[in-house]
């Protein structure tokens, strides 16, 4: 810190600041990729609870979530946190039966897809979808906005320190001009 006793606020960013930044700059945010919220479950095909699991993954009330969590050890994969937005490319890379060629077959909202192979049954359901060109939700941009605010503060801090150094040098006549 500079020797003048000023406190410097750089890293603490409040939710209000992030929301304000988002609202002020909302016209600058445009998705360049599709985002989705989804549920995914991969379960051995011989699981005795398969009918309940199918029903629960589709509706997913709190009780259903508790039931699925209690069976978690039986699943090869479980992703039921459908309140988080994911980039379509990340979903495609993490779910083996979805690829660039067939992705449009699996992107209808609230439709349960059941994909079977020799060992497993895969359940996949898109709960929400935002196509590229739309404005992304704040929750998706939150960390990026926070980082932007911190970086802007750092730039302002450096500029202010440089000004203070220059002003101090001018006041005390302790400077040299280089040509």
Locations of regions flagged by a protein language model:
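Peptidyl-prolyl cis-trans isomerase
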Residues: 1-179
